[in-house]
Curated annotation (Swiss-Prot):
CDD domains (alphabetical): Ribosomal_uL14 (cd00337)
UniProt-recorded name of the protein: Large ribosomal subunit protein uL14c
GO cellular component, one term: mitochondrial large ribosomal subunit
Subunit text: Part of the 50S ribosomal subunit.
Function description: Binds to 23S rRNA.
PANTHER family: 50S/60S RIBOSOMAL PROTEIN L14/L23 (PTHR11761), LARGE RIBOSOMAL SUBUNIT PROTEIN UL14M (PTHR11761:SF3)
The family this protein is said to belong to: Belongs to the universal ribosomal protein uL14 family.
Keywords, sorted A to Z: Chloroplast, Plastid, Ribonucleoprotein, Ribosomal protein, RNA-binding, rRNA-binding
Location (main, coarse): plastid
One GO-annotated biological process of the protein: translation
NCBIfam families given in the database record: rplN_bact (TIGR01067)
Length: 121
């Protein structure tokens, strides 16, 4: 569960390393789960890259430390909270995605993120 003020690692090559969630999009929602869209501010970035520190970005949550239950009864959780930075059309701004992503991303029709990911769990 990603609340406002939660720090997330960035799972792509846009230049941002860490972002802090400042808003969960979609109604009056308190927290975000895998596949949800958030607004974040870049807290740590690589120099000489397109995304700088203190930029406001839109991101899709791809991994959470909180255990999620799938309809078939299986439980899954990850070691970290991670997101992929996207543009307003929900296409990733980077050209690579690092680490595994959850299958729920495919179910929410973020097929471009799934195609860039090395592993879908």
């Amino acid at each position: 569960m990603i609340y406002p003020q939660t720090m997330l690692t960035v799972a792509d090559n846009t230049g941002a390393r860490k972002i802090m969630c400042i808003r969960v999009l979609g109604g009056n929602r308190k927290y975000a789960k895998i596949g949800d869209t958030i607004i974040g501010v870049v807290k740590e970035a690589i120099p000489n890259m397109p995304i700088k520190r203190s930029d406001i970005v839109r991101a899709i949550v791809v991994r959470t430390s909180k255990t999620i239950r799938r309809p078939d009864g299986m439980y899954i959780r990850f070691d970290d909270n991670a997101a992929v930075i996207v543009n307003l059309d929900n296409n990733p701004r980077g050209t690579r995605v690092f680490g595994p992503v959850a299958r729920e991303i495919r179910d929410k029709n973020f097929s471009k993120i799934v195609s860039l990911a090395p592993e879908v769990l």
